[in-house]
Structures are given as structure tokens and as C-alpha cells.
């Protein structure tokens, strides 16, 4: 049944590819990857394997800079704000002549900035991101959960208290999850995605802490769904014209940290047909275009899959798709340059791991008694894809090893007690911007 809760994204899907490719030949077009961590590295490899030139724009040391598939690296001081991102893209366009290339954001705040400035950016780049009306439904979890409720998509019990007095309306004794409506307003201050409270007294204390960090009205309280990684699932897709042209369903068996993971560390493709219909219903309602991941958790109390999060960009383990038969970044590129894209769906039973976070997380879980060593070792058998290591492109994995001390401070790979001092930072000093183009300069597109 057609949903009536549609949000107009401002995109005419019948003309999107033609509009995006006007005035350019596909062979002259490359990809601009915004963020060069393992997620961005996967995008670069996806495009580079097909001979597509790649430029990485980043504000920190990252593994993609060492990839043989990256022709150009643009280092800037900051990418977190809308102004800094637009400035970085302008520098990339003017100094490297990469106009009309396809943009690949890897961070939520960059997706929001591209959506807010989409029309202005279309004259210089291909922007495979819908307008802000659609993106806000994914970026702001208040909008995500309200829309899901209108569409009868299961979600955890959720409350939106504006003040501490509103906690009286929370008719549950816990345990609770306290999270921000907009992740970036909380994550960069705390290094975590959410906090847990087991009692109502803890809930009040944690709410006060969260309310002191995020803007008024941005604190969300949810019931904590029981169960570990075996209950974490996701539906991933390239969505176009109201349909999933490509899709992949996964179980996110392990994540870092184990309680409220910032990123998955061990993922396998599975066949769970129940996730497709609610996901497609949600994406149709917001008029979505592009790559997308919808995170769910199966509630063992009632067997329902409940929507937790929507990520309107490539996700950390997107390279699992290529091993399972779906090369998501390349499919998006083909669509952006007007090439045909055939419907494809990932095969089940394919596994992905990121050793840099999975191993230390497993050690902590083994010490805590929540994971048995034998079970962990058996899970490593038959892994098909590692997030960074590749025989065809080995340098990034060497670079990652060298970066581990930096990542331990920057990305929170250290135990929590060692990360408590937020003043402890490891920074690599930069000029305002640095451009490295020692391999092959970006091709200049001719109109």
C-alpha cells in the first residue's frame, strides 16, 4: 500500500541521471571521497579497480592516502563544519580541476552539508545526495522515529523529554539508552554514541549530563532492547526511483564498543526477508536517492526487528558488498554518469572483519566473560574480506599499523579509563591545506 507520509526531497527521479551527467563524458569523470578512513579507502578501491581516478579530501591522517588507487590527496584543517567542507571542495575544484566529479561523503555531518547546499554544488560536482528535506529524516533521530511510527515500522519505546521534569512521562523502570537526536552534537564531545542507565535515578543523572552537552530538546530516551551482536541487523541498499536497485542484508555480530557500537567490527551477509519491506517503505516516504544503511535490532521478547538508526551514506563495512556480489560505490558512480545499472542483491554467508578494532574489543569481552576464546577463534574461519588489508593494495594496511597509536587516541581504541581525559590528544600539525598529487593529476573535464 502506498504510504501517505511522504517527504518531498525536491528531486525529480525521472530526470536525475540526465541532469547529473550533462556536459561530461563518463571516461573523464572521477570520484571525490570526503574522508579517507577505511570506509573511504573502500570507495577508492571500488572506483580505482575500474580505472576511475580518485581524489581523497581529508582533515586527518588516514589509510586511503597510501592506496595505489588514490591519485590525489587534499589535506585540509577541518571538515566538520558546513563552511569548512564547502571551502575544501572549492579548493579541490579550483586547484585540481576536478569539477563535475562524483562526491562521496563518509560522515553524517558532511552528508547534511551537501544536502543543504545541493543545488549550489550541482554546477561544480555530481552530488548523489537528496535535499535536506529527505536527509533530515535520517540525520535527526527525532524525525526518524516519528516517521517510523507513522509508517508502522517497529521501533524501541521512545521518549523525547525537553526538560528533566518531562522524565515523569517515561513509564518504564529501565534499563534505558540515552542518545542524542543528532549524533555529531554528542559524539565529538563524548567519544560515544549513547549512554546507559539501569534505574530511574541513573536516568535522571545521565539526562542532566546529556542535556549539558547537546542543544535543548535533543536528548532521546529509549528502552534498551536485550541481546547482543546476534540480534543486530542492517538493510543496505542503493535506492533509486522508489526501489532498491541493489541491496544487502547483514547481521552485525560484533561492534566497537560492544554495548553501543560506533562501528561494526564483524559482519556477515544473511537472508532476512523481513527487513526489506519496512526499509523500502521508509525510503519511499522520504523520496530517498543514493546509498543507505538502516540499522535494526531484533527484540527477542516479541521477535520483531526494531529500527535503531538510518545512515544516509556509505557505511563502514560497505566493502562486504563487493565480496557478496554488490559493489555499492561503483553502482552509484555508474548511475551518476548515466550508465545502466542492473538490479543485484548480495548473496548470504559472506563475512567481513576489521581486525584493528575487532581484536582489542574481543580481548575486552573475553576478559569480561562475555565471549569465549574458542568461539572467537572459530568466528575467524572463513572471513572473506578485511576492512583494510588487500594483496592488490597492501600499503594501507602497513599505514594503519603505523597509525594505530594515533587512532587509539583519535578514534577511541583505548580502554575507556584511558580515554577519560578529553584533554589528552594526539594531533598531526597541518598547514591550512596541503595537496599531494605525486601520482597522477586529476583529469580536467571539458564541457
Located regions from the model:
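Phosphate-binding site of ATP-dependent enzymes
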Residues: 198-258, 269-280, 297-298, 304-306
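Short, glycine/polar-rich helix-capping loops at beta-to-alpha or helix-loop-helix junctions
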Residues: 56-70
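Peripheral (often C-terminal) accessory segments that flank ATP-dependent C-N-forming ligase machineries
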Residues: 13, 19-20, 334-447
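Glycine-rich phosphate/pyrophosphate-binding beta-alpha loops
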Residues: 253-257, 262-264, 311-326
